[in-house]
Amino acid sequence: MGSRWQMEKKHDPYYKKAKKEDYRSRASYKIKQLDKKFKLIKEGDTVVDLGAAPGGWSQVALEKVGEEGLVIGVDLNRIKPFPEENFHGIRGDFTTTEVQEKVMNLIGGKAKVVISDASPSLCGIKNIDQLRSIDLTNTVIGIADNILEPKGNLVMKVFQGPEYKDMLTRLKKKYRQVKTTKPPSSRKKSSEMYVVGLDFKPKKNKKSKD
């Protein structure tokens, strides 16, 4: 199984392209294609990358935001530092309050974009894997609710399951536009999809009456 996967990887055009163009992973082309289609990241933006290791998405985000922007990558695994000083890596579980507070402190305000190519730990049992995927998706949505500025953007990996449609319905109440897509660089065999939320509409705090 391992040798077959290695052979497929070597013949993968995006794997070869990433090696040639010095990207950390073939996943870099997913966010490049998503950004080209939806104009997610602009120069000067603050971007939070959830599940960032090895850093393929953060690498592209750094290119897009330029010197005036900021990219924060979070992952359980170590993210090898980038030469750019405007990248901050956090090693930890982004589903925990402690790590989320670290992100908030680094931002010092709100983020313009939340990106996530994170996948849950899969065990091969369909029902359990779907529940884990739903939990992870809900966590990413919740973090975006807390840290996105008005009109901010979200893009995240999802796997279709029983609660997929309900999740899209909820997102449509939070963002002016919600799109689903599968970029060309996603493997055809993969069941992954990407959900894009454009123009975040934060809940307005109700003023208490005197």
From Swiss-Prot:
Its EC number is 2.1.1.166. Keywords: Cytoplasm, Methyltransferase, rRNA processing, S-adenosyl-L-methionine, Transferase. GO terms for cellular component: cytoplasm. The active site is at K157 (proton acceptor). S-adenosyl-L-methionine binds at G55, W57, D75, D93, D117. HAMAP family: RNA_methyltr_E. It is found in: Cytoplasm. It catalyses: uridine(2552) in 23S rRNA + S-adenosyl-L-methionine = 2'-O-methyluridine(2552) in 23S rRNA + S-adenosyl-L-homocysteine + H(+). Its main location: cytoplasm. GO terms for molecular function: rRNA (uridine-2'-O-)-methyltransferase activity. It is an enzyme of class 2 (transferase). Specifically methylates the uridine in position 2552 of 23S rRNA at the 2'-O position of the ribose in the fully assembled 50S ribosomal subunit. Residues 175-210 are annotated as: Disordered. Gene3D superfamilies: Vaccinia Virus protein VP39. This is Ribosomal RNA large subunit methyltransferase E. Signal peptide: none annotated. It comes from Methanobrevibacter smithii (strain ATCC 35061 / DSM 861 / OCM 144 / PS). The keyword Lipoprotein does not apply. The keyword S-adenosyl-L-methionine applies. Belongs to the class I-like SAM-binding methyltransferase superfamily. RNA methyltransferase RlmE family.
